[in-house]
Amino acid sequence: MIISREKFMKIANVAEELGCKVVYDSTKKISFNTRMYITVPYEFTLENAYALAHEIGHVIDYVNDELDHDKWFHDWSYRVNAEMSAWVHAYKLLEKLEIPLHHWQSHVNSKLANYFILPKVI
């Protein structure tokens, strides 16, 4: 589903307000890094809007000293909690910006399945 450029850029502006640069690149994985960059395709889809908001959720935790990036890489139990936190931040952000949430649950469910790789999570 397509959203307007204006709505998508509202989300991107939140990252910029937090001191994080949004880099548009469809050849790289959607991600946040501790150099304060989020990479996302320049495509105005609801899926990309959800993904961008999720990465901003990581930024929020990082700037509030609530995300240990090294632990995120090496501890699957920690990662699951960090991912859930980012999704909660994303939901609140999207709701505040009045981005449609009718595909939110199915999107998040499909992404969360990737984090539950047992026995690594236990």
Question: Language model features by range: what are they?
Answer:
Residues E6-K7, E43-L46, Y91-I122:
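Long, well-structured alpha-helical subdomains associated
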Residues H54, H58:
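Histidine-centered divalent metal-coordination motifs
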Residues Y62-K92:
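Post-HEXXH active-site segment of zinc metalloproteases
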Residues A51:
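Acidic/histidine-rich
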